[in-house]
Design a protein with these regions (language model features):
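A short glycine-rich, Lys/Arg-flanked "PGG" loop and its adjoining helix->strand segment in the class I
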Residues: 123-138
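Short conserved AdoMet
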Residues: 64, 87, 120, 134, ...
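Conserved N-terminal segment of class I S-adenosyl-L-methionine
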Residues: 1-103, 109-111, 238-241, 251-265
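Conserved class I S-adenosyl-L-methionine
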Residues: 138-167
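Acceptor-substrate binding/catalytic loop of class I
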Residues: 173-188
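Short N-terminal helix/helix-N-cap motif within the alpha/beta-hydrolase-1
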Residues: 60, 77, 119-124, 151
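A C-terminal cap/extension of S-adenosyl-L-methionine-dependent methyltransferases
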Residues: 187-265
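A short SAM/SAH-binding and catalytic strip from SAM-dependent methyltransferases
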Residues: 109-120
Length: 265
């Protein structure tokens, strides 16, 4: 496999994409963030797009939250499963993230959850999402970074830190494949990748009140009891940032939280 060859059957390689319980839990978390950012009770009347939808569980949750929902992916086996189960309420299409089959300014909400590291051209994907998102619309981002201690796809410590050849060798020695495909950006690189958006960081709000954001499955109870300064000190060790990016200048419109979202600069 070449370094950035497209992954055309990702759900066949990563069983976690078919774990319905965990995927729906992730969906509830991201919907809670979106609702707070937009200051809405549900997504009724909004048009939503899940980029990299695979088997469709997150897209289905968006639809059940009231949004007219679309899902795109190049993972045709995953899309076949999605259409079979959820095709009556979600429009699923085979499409690349850098060539979305939607008009300019046509989406209110876009989801890009743990996807950028797995696509051939992240910059092109992010640019085309910006094109289809309406002014004032939001892009939900679940983004890992290069310095995460535990790499989330293969659950191997420090894997994303390594040069390609060493990462491939590590993966083989661990019995988890032959080629490490994912490519993570540093935190500074992530800020550059999403520089066209007004980005707000919800990572600390989720850590401070995981129940409100349906994150209590992954956030230990003791973490939520830490003061804000201590939570902020933990941020470099957090493997996934929870960001909400507005097209144009925007700010969260939901009620006050125990810890407020911070603008990413």
């Amino acid at each position: 496999m070449s370094e950035r060859e497209e992954q055309l059957a990702y759900s066949e390689q990563m069983a976690k994409m078919l774990d319905e319980g965990k995927r729906r839990q992730k969906a509830r978390k991201l919907i809670a963030v979106i609702r707070h950012g937009l200051g809405v009770e549900d997504l009724t009347g909004l048009r939503a797009l899940d980029v990299g939808c695979s088997a469709g569980f997150i897209a289905d949750e968006l639809a059940m939250a009231g949004a007219a929902t679309h899902g795109v992916d190049i993972d045709e086996p995953g899309l076949a499963k999605a259409r079979q189960r959820f095709g009556d309420r979600v429009d699923f299409q085979v499409a690349r993230g850098e060539d979305l089959p939607f008009a300019d300014d046509s989406m209110d909400v876009v989801v890009l959850n743990h996807i950028y590291e797995s696509v051939a051209n992240p910059e092109a994907v992010v640019a085309d999402i910006h094109r289809v998102l309406r002014p004032g619309g939001v892009l939900y981002l679940g983004v890992g970074h290069k310095w995460q201690v535990l790499e989330p796809h293969h659950r191997l410590p420090l894997l994303s830190w390594l040069p390609q050849r060493l990462a491939d060798r590590y993966l083989r020695l661990a019995g988890k494949g032959d080629h490490y495909y994912e490519h993570y950006y540093t935190p500074a690189g992530l800020r550059r990748l999403f520089a066209a958006y007004d980005v707000w960081d919800y990572t600390l709000p989720v850590l401070a009140d995981p129940v409100a954001f349906a994150g209590d499955d992954i956030v230990p109870a003791w973490v939520s009891r830490l003061p804000e300064r201590a939570l902020a000190a933990l941020l470099p060790a957090v493997p996934t940032y929870v960001w909400l990016a507005f097209k144009g200048t925007g700010a969260p419109e939901g009620p006050d939280l125990a810890v407020a979202p911070r603008r990413v600069r």
